[in-house]
Amino acid sequence: MTDNDVTGNDVAGLQRRLAEFAAARDWQPYHTPKNLAAALSVEASELLEIFQWLTPEQAERVMDDSGSAHRVADEVADVLAYLLQFCTVLGIDPLAALAAKIDRNEVRFPVRKRGGEAGEEGKGEAEREGEGEA
């Protein structure tokens, strides 16, 4: 058993803590799939806002500054909190869903290298058609 398991910081433990937090405040009526999806989008936008006008080089160094590092970590936590609550409400196992998606993408987008770089031949059919997604 890891320290995370003991403190409830594994995924299931965090989902329980979030559910208990909402229940203690009578927030469950507001935690509908639509509302949680909207809140997730808002929080993801707040994460993006931190990086909006940064150059790629500045973005790579964002965690070097304690103030911006704290903001990024807080927004990541907000995104994860709403995603976990969304999964709880809909009965989705987030780790199983991610593993299944990675499996599908490995089939959809096989590795094909040409000259050490993934060129047009290295892209899956859907990606060439503009349908590629993570």
Positions of PLM-derived features:
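Flexible "arm" and connector segments at domain edges
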Residues: M1-A134
